Each structure stands twice: as structure tokens, then as C-alpha cells.
Amino acid sequence: MKILALEFSSPHRSVAVVGNVRGPGTWTETEAVETGDRSNRPFELIQDVLTQARLERVQVEGLAIGLGPGSYTGIRGAIAIAQGWKLARDVRLMGISSAECLAAQAHSDGLRGRVSVVIDAQRGEFYLANYELDSSEWREVQPLRLAPAEEVAASGAKGDVLVGPEVQNWFQEGRILFPRAATLGKLALKKTEFIEGQHLEPIYLRKSSFLKAPPPRILPDGSPL
């Protein structure tokens, strides 16, 4: 399968093409990365990797989207692109946790043992997931959850390597690691289940704090309160 992967959940936004672009038994992996909190040229990145891979848009068979947690704006942008692509071309869609992508990236980079993925959740909290990495694979030990700084620090104190896009802002011993679209695409190639565009949603574990305003009260003279 020829997969276009979009990973926009961190300040290092990336797009990649992975798969058997040249036919069965071949392998292609191309990637383009843009850095900065205000990076906003996704279609240029997409065209860059398609050109590098010598692939036309109509040849893309699947889109893999990093669902976060992370930059809500970036993730929403990637989802919108995938939904539009699905409407224009009947491609397969896959949504993948960016925390899983980071675990796979850590394994690919040679880390072994216990690894904790740490992503800023704001409000003094973090998204935290724990993994075990050995020579052949990685596996989830504790699933993604919201955690206070004390729990993250405790994971590090137990010997976990803390990894994440901005982890050193809070934990100096951590290792900076960004989720990569190329890694996301390789994870997607192992997927056998696909999702409809309307069901793609950012991973956001915190309950909404927005309250619906009550209806206006009408005074005896007929004017609203």
C-alpha cells in the first residue's frame, strides 16, 4: 500500500510517503519536516514528499493521521486534509496515537528498557504512557492518561527514560523526541482496520470545561435580562 502520513501534533510537523511505491517487493520512505509553532504550509509539505517519491496524488491509497495528544490546531488540520482527500479520492484512513508513534520512534532510535512518553497537557498536567522496549519490539505497559508532574517524576525516578517533544522544559533528564510521519506511516502499514473520516477525532483525555449558557430570562415588560 502507498501511504501518505501526516503528523502535525508537535512543533515539528512532518509528512511522509511510505510503502511499495515502485510496486510489490519494493520499499519507499520519503519525509519532509517543518519546524516552528506557527508552521502552516501542509500542502507544500505534501507536494514535496509526493515529488520526492515520484508519486501522483491519485496514486495514494491510504492516509495515516497522528491523532495526538498535542497541538489541537495541528491535529485538526491534518484531520481536515484527510477528510477532504477521502471525499475526493476513496482512500483508506487510519488514525494513530502520537504517543504510540513516539514509542515506536524511541525503539527505532535504539532506546531499550522502560520508556515513558510525556506530552504537555497544560494546566500543570501531562499526558503519560509507559512502554517496555526490547531488542525486537515495544509494548505498552500502562496506557495513555493524564498525570500530575509528580507521577511523571516518579516514573523517571524508577528508571524510565522520559521522552517527548518538550519534555526538558519540565524534566531536565528527559530526551527530546518528536513524533515522525515516517514512523507513523510504518505503523499504519501494519493496520488492518480503517476508519471513516467523520470518526477521526483528536485524542483529548480531559473532559470539556465549557458550560452551556442558560436561556435568557424575560422580564415582565418583555425585555431580556
Role assignments for model-derived ranges:
Residues 46-62, 133, 152-160:
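Phosphate/pyrophosphate-binding loops at sites that engage ATP/ADP/AMP, CoA/4′-phosphopantetheine
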Residues 40, 44-47, 61, 79, ...:
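N-terminal, well-ordered alpha-helical segments
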Residues 62-93:
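DPxDG-like acidic metal-binding loop motif
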Residues 31-51:
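N-terminal phosphate-binding loop and adjacent alpha-helix
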Residues 1-24, 34-41, 94-225:
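Oxyanion-binding and handling regions
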Residues 26-28:
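Conserved phosphate-binding/catalytic region of the ribokinase-like
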